[in-house]
Structures are given as C-alpha cells and as structure tokens.
Amino acid sequence: MIGQPAGIIERAFELAQRSANVEEIRFQLRKEGYSNVDGHLMGRKIRADLVKVIRRVA
C-alpha cells in the first residue's frame, strides 16, 4: 500500500492523535481533499471513537 492515500476513516484516526477535537479533524480532512467528510464522520460511534483517541493522547 505504499504510495496510496489513506482512506478517510483511517486518516481521521491518524489525525485524532494530534487534534484537539473532531471539528479540527473534519477541517483537516477537507483541506487534504477528502470528500463527503461530514457523511463519513456523522455517526455517533465514529465520533465517540475519535474522541477516545483524542483524550488518550491529550
């Protein structure tokens, strides 16, 4: 998989390790050119999992 961009969910979890909140992750994903960011991150479970990563690193 070298050279292939990360999928949006995988990239969201990478960003969670150095983000302050989910909105910051959304902003960065849009900036990186990912589409349908809100659709991918709207679920309660995915948001809760991202917050867990953010809090664990903080």
What does each model-identified segment do?
Residues 39-40, 52-58:
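Short Lys/Arg-enriched helix C-cap and helix-to-coil transition segments
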Residues 2-20, 45-54:
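Positively charged, polyanion-binding regions of nucleic-acid-associated proteins
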Residues 1, 27-30, 34-35:
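Preference for short coil/turn "hinge" residues that link or interrupt alpha-helices
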Residues 32-46:
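Short, positively charged loop/turn segments that connect secondary-structure elements
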Residues 17-30:
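Short, charged amphipathic recognition helices of the HTH superfamily
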